[in-house]
Amino acid sequence: MNDDVVRGSAIIADGKGRFGIDTIEVDPPAAGEVRVAITAAGVCHTDHASLSWPGPRVMGHEGAGYVEAVGEGVEGLQIGQPVVLNWAIPCGHCFQCERGAAPLCERTHELDVAHLGTSRAHAGATRWRGRPIERAFHLGTFARYTLVRAEAVTPLPPNLLLDVACILGCAVMTGVGSAINVAAVAPGDTVAVLGCGGVGLNVIQGARIAGARTIIAIDRVPARLERARELGATHALAPDEADRDHIRLVAQVHALTAGRGADHAFEATGVPALAFLPLKLARNGGNALQVSGAHGPASMELTELFWNKRYLAPLYGGCVPSRDFPRLFEWIAQGRLELAALISHRYPMEALDRAFDDMLQGRGTKGVLRIA
């Protein structure tokens, strides 16, 4: 165990839409905690949305790095071991956990070490300019060091590069899990995926792994559609901007699914106005899922819910890290789950503004920050 306080760079949001790089201090881990030296972190729409959350806070919720220090009682983790982080830490005992809904754990905030008011961070375990600071999703992966519960840390298999593995904890888990755990895509099913960024491409991978017969990728960016094809999409549709009511797009999806609509239709664009479009793409009795975590108001005609259509907005792909990380690792080893092909851009910490702009403008598929 390293008993020293460490200092390192972090990207800090001020709660008013601005962010900057500064130095934070991180205490050594207490019992049941691990301090991780982050080397790479994924960038997603939720990180951009967090700019408006109450601040200040250390940004970032996808990341990978090395175990730098372990607290008393931590087993199975060694200093120097490569690890990936996750923010969904179930307690295992609350109402939701006992009914098998661990991603909805009612005590998640109590189990972290970064939530001010309920944990050691309130007393200053992580500090910025001499004052306690919160970390996004209990992690704050846009920082050289983070202090987390041991349950948030999963050892990585050999030969899995950190700047690739860093996206496993959210984008991959959410996308693949939404297809397999929540929608329960089955062999022979038809799937439509609206939006082919980091989450959408992993929905496509999950559907392919599950044995879907038809996987329809929908995006306005040709490069994203090409990548979707490479990762398992059987068809690629580029919506026409003139088709504002999506009449033509809906007709195209129905034409590819025997006139019925898809068994499962996913929204992964992050655009609130498109949140309910999957209901038009799904067949009667089918599933429509909003998996992008889109923020903002949206409206729909209630008739879209007729004919036994189900609308779901799953959290974290219904994943339980202790169960689902081993499955992801197995699929990676088998060559069934691609990671490197998902990442289109890598940026230094100083270029987060450019990473956000590329993401919001649809340039590329998934961005990763190099943390130093």
Placement of each model-derived feature along the sequence:
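Adenosine-nucleotide cofactor-binding segment
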Residues: 190-196, 208-275
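Glycine-rich beta-strand-centered segment in the early N-terminal region that forms part
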Residues: 25-41, 51-98, 103, 111, ...
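C-terminal hydrophobic helical "lid"/dimerization subdomain
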Residues: 1-6, 276-280, 322-372
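Glycine-rich phosphate-binding loop and adjacent beta-alpha segment
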Residues: 212, 271-336, 371-372
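NAD(P)H dinucleotide-binding glycine-rich loop of Rossmann-like/cofactor-binding domains
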Residues: 37, 93-194
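N-terminal Rossmann-fold NAD(P) dinucleotide-binding loop
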Residues: 200-201
